[in-house]
Amino acid sequence: MLDRLKSIEERYEKLNEYLSDPEVVNDPTKLREYSKEQSDIQETVEVYRQYRAAYDQLSEAKAMLEDKLDAEMRDMVKEEISELTEETERLEDELKILLIPKDPNDNKNVIVEVRGAAGGEEAALFAGNLYRMYSRYAEMQGWKTEVMEASVTGTGGYKEIIFMISGKGAYSKLKFENGAHRVQRVPETESGGRIHTSTATVAVLPEAEEVEIDIHEKDIRVDTFTSSGPGGQSVNTTMSAVRLTHLPTGVVVSCQDEKSQIKNKEKAMKVLRARIYDKFQREAQAEYDQTRKSAVGTGDRSERIRTYNFPQNRVTDHRIGLTIQKLDQILEGKLDEVIDALIMEDQARKLQNAK
């Protein structure tokens, strides 16, 4: 492990040299490439240097015990050794996690698709709850949320809402939200007070950059139509709504959120690119390993990953057996406790697999 860390540090120093080179500074492609690589390994290098400093201090403290010391001084050195041993062990564990191969999509923006599933109008209302939850969470992280497309129901729920969350590390946190989310509550229209169960599905796609996936204009069919509001009534007499069909894959995306056809097409292209990128990634993963599916973040949209029980103010994540009696807070966007637990479980599994 130490040899690997040393080579990472050497690479980091080499990248510093590159980024000071005028030839690189004047080449946007190289500058972006080297800056990203440096950013990806910076934390590992910083923790490695902390570890090395603590290890050197520990060695010096142990050497002091070889000298003739009075009882008080010996006790002080032993206490320092105990503290430094604990510190080096903590940093070593942190380095093991940092050396786990990273998901190349982790720092990307995400496109989130939330759809009401089983449960009719109640499922659509729950889809609205989830959209609000993710919007609040994004706001707390300092990220930006932008609605790409929404299909609103008569009661204010969503048959479907697609939105982008932009911010560093968005995919690393939100990728675990892929799957079916179940809600248990008494609908406002239920006079008998019976608890109903409904579901909404969530798909989290990393935003695909143009350099990562090549989409040719000739492969896209563009259809335009008039925008419509809840219930199908026309809200725009111009042909501003856009439907894009990627002919080779059959992926279809519609957007009518903006009044401008150009803006709708731009938004639709972002979603189309992300969906095609996600499709290729999932196909490649399935080909790589058809039988193995991780317990966390598999991306299986039919999987029931979490239950939101309103009468008991309870949220249960079924993948890791986590139950929290803070449903009200979680729906306000306070998702850290759930997401952090999922990340820790994912890291532990990867560490185990790496042994």
Swiss-Prot record:
Principal subcellular localization: cytoplasm
Modified residues (N5-methylglutamine): 233
Entry keywords, A to Z: Cytoplasm, Methylation, Protein biosynthesis
Cellular compartment(s): Cytoplasm
SMART domains: PCRF
Annotated Pfam families: PCRF (PF03462), RF-1 (PF00472)
PTM characteristics: Methylated by PrmC. Methylation increases the termination efficiency of RF1.
One term of GO molecular function: translation release factor activity, codon specific
Listed GO CC annotations: cytoplasm
Function per UniProt: Peptide chain release factor 1 directs the termination of translation in response to the peptide chain termination codons UAG and UAA.
Family label: Belongs to the prokaryotic/mitochondrial release factor family.
Protein name, UniProt field: Peptide chain release factor 1
GN (gene name): prfA
